Amino acid sequence: MLNSLELEGRPQDTRVVVAMSGGVDSSVTAALLKSEGYDVVGITLQLYDHGAATHRKGACCAGQDIHDARNVAERLGIPHYVLDYENRFRETVIENFADSYASGETPVPCIECNRLVKFRDLLATARELGAAALATGHYVASHRMAGGSRALLCAADADRDQSYFLFATTREQLDFLRFPLGDMTKPQTRELARSFGLSVADKHDSQDICFVPTGRYTDIISQLKPNAMVSGDIVDLDGHVIGHHDGIVHFTVGQRRGLGIASGAPLYVLSLDAANRRVVVGPREALKMHRIILRDVNWIGDGALDRAVGAGLELFVRVRSTRKPQPAWLRAIDGRYEIELVAGEEGVSPGQACVFYDGLEGQARVLGGGFIARAMARRANEIAAQNGTPAQPLAAELRG
């Protein structure tokens, strides 16, 4: 007989570790499991020096958050532990974040935190404590499939769906993880928090880049990678210098504001050339990319990745967390994986994730994904074939 977490055994005989950030979502997760009779243990990770962020709203795992998590644990009558992961977090997330920006990418630190800290080290700690599962307050769902393995699904609340940030979860991790809020909406979660009498029921939601107390990510980069703040040129697609900048870390692909260039038509950041400290700008139509080269691809769909891809796999991809999935093809070419975007996408930035889904609507299944290494416009001969005109060289076909 399976319990509500789709595990063998009665709830009272099943230990579950809950990752408690001090926010309403993880607090309700702990409260729900406790109310169902599970043996719940709360763990909070201290991820960075929170002195400067103690009074900042929306910072995950800052001093106030640890205090809130402890209060919730006391309210629920569950054991609670705070683990110092500052060094691990700095080495695997913060330093990688700075390196990525310095190389001209736009990173997603929450993915790295989930992949390298929460779902690796914390999961290992949960096993050491004898837990049968690690539960989090993420808005995603996971369901047991016929063969016993688990599928990762989008949240029922599309506005809160966090599947983009969890694409790098491995199959082994997915089998151990549980997401009790996946079929709920945020208002329902807050209402449950009130019904449980939790002090965090109306607490502000946490924000990305939790380790930037001032809200200025360039402060972190200037400390760790001062060379990334070196000035350089802003150039057009033909390489003509049309302006100057104070460091490529101030820019991201698709950016329009803050260029400091007088132009008759709007200009957008098309790519960042870190080696030459150049920011390439151009018209909006030059932003549309149709091909993406991926790195560090993770596959959690059925079977082996190469067999699933075959000559080409039709799926849907999301290239930014705020965008809806779009139709695409995944192909294996010359020992690497590439995405062909059927309709093209603007502002495809190296360093962001490209996440695979099996559908557009509802609780689509997450099939995996990879990080964007490069994005390209269609080849000149493809455009010529579409327009019925002779092929012409494409200026700056390669972005990133």
Curated annotation (Swiss-Prot):
Annotated protein name in UniProt: tRNA-specific 2-thiouridylase MnmA
Major localisation: cytoplasm
InterPro entries for this protein: MnmA-like, MnmA-like_C, MnmA-like_central, MnmA-like_central_sf, Rossmann-like_a/b/a_fold
Main enzyme class: transferase
PANTHER family assigned: MITOCHONDRIAL TRNA-SPECIFIC 2-THIOURIDYLASE 1 (PTHR11933:SF5), TRNA 5-METHYLAMINOMETHYL-2-THIOURIDYLATE -METHYLTRANSFERASE (PTHR11933)
GN (gene name): mnmA
Protein location: Cytoplasm
Entry EC number(s): 2.8.1.13
Gene Ontology molecular functions: ATP binding; tRNA binding; tRNA-uridine 2-sulfurtransferase activity
Interaction with tRNA, as annotated region: 160-162
Record keywords, A-Z: ATP-binding, Cytoplasm, Disulfide bond, Nucleotide-binding, RNA-binding, Transferase, tRNA processing, tRNA-binding
